[in-house]
Amino acid sequence: MPWIQLTLSCSEEHAPQVGDMLMANGAQAVTYRDGADTPIFEPRPGDVILWEHTLATGLFDADADIKAIIANLKQSNIFGSDLQYKVDALEDKDWEREWMDNFHPIQFGENLWICPSWREIPKPEAVNILLDPGMAFGTGTHPTTAMCLRWIDANPPTGKTVVDFGCGSGILGIAALLFKAEHVVGIDIDQQALIATKDNAERNKVGDKFSLYLPSQQPETQVDLVLANVLAGPLRELADTILGFVSPGGQLVLSGILERQIEGVIEAYQPHIKFDTPTIDGDWAMLSGTRVG
């Protein structure tokens, strides 16, 4: 069955609404891509982390009235007469090949890779996460996740207990376990994220060491390392909860923070955390530190 692919250019702020509009107009699937071709492996459930310039692509049946769909989109306050779009016709095999061709093994730090299952592993002796992102998972990795993965690579949590707070696809917890962490507790507000994490952990043969909870069920525990890749707002609002997981002398990694939000997030965790120098990647920042009180 042939398909029609409609790609729209929009801002990060409007991308989730654009995706909703594409689905409301009959799209069978929606993917997001950075306008500069920076891909993503891990979106946030209910709060998609995107980019300053985003391409949202809807996949429609071949008999969809694309002209009418475009006319509908032009009526929105988001686009109006400034709608920028591209229409492509794809055969089934073309869509599948195009989607798969967008995924390649990606290296983080010295010894950590993410590898789609259909690609040859470039470095078998390295730590390799096997991750087959579905269409909703985009086409690569966002800087917030990449910084965390590089931190894990540089600070292997061997023998440590870990909380992956806002686990999403489970990629950070899986990385910790593949670096020989003792156990990971994953927490997320989205049940579908927990299902995805469970599947990904089992694919990487660490499912027996990855316990998963909704916030209402999360255990009262303290661990050696807490990884929280969410957004600055929740990091501030949930500071007491997140701090409660960090054992004395334990480590804390916070990501999903814009550079201009660093000071506000640090204030929420002082005086309990002694932070290292922030890690910066583009407009994004990651904070790491040690619990001192």
Swiss-Prot record:
Entry's localization field: Cytoplasm
Positions annotated to bind S-adenosyl-L-methionine: 145, 166, 188, 229
Catalyzed reactions per annotation: L-lysyl-[protein] + 3 S-adenosyl-L-methionine = N(6),N(6),N(6)-trimethyl-L-lysyl-[protein] + 3 S-adenosyl-L-homocysteine + 3 H(+)
Record lineage: Bacteria, Pseudomonadati, Pseudomonadota, Gammaproteobacteria, Alteromonadales
Protein EC: 2.1.1.-
Biological process according to GO: methylation
Membrane-crossing segments per the record: none
PANTHER family per record: ELECTRON TRANSFER FLAVOPROTEIN BETA SUBUNIT LYSINE METHYLTRANSFERASE (PTHR43648:SF1)
One Pfam short name: PrmA
GO MF entry, a single one: protein-lysine N-methyltransferase activity
GO cellular component terms attached to this protein's record: cytosol
Gene name in the database record: prmA
Listed NCBIfam families: prmA (TIGR00406)
UniProtKB keywords: Cytoplasm, Methyltransferase, S-adenosyl-L-methionine, Transferase
InterPro entries: Ribosomal_L11_MeTrfase_PrmA (IPR050078), Ribosomal_PrmA_MeTrfase (IPR004498), SAM-dependent_MTases_sf (IPR029063)
Family affiliation: Belongs to the methyltransferase superfamily. PrmA family.
Free-text function comment from the UniProt entry: Methylates ribosomal protein L11.
Protein name (database record): Ribosomal protein L11 methyltransferase
Transferase in keyword set: yes
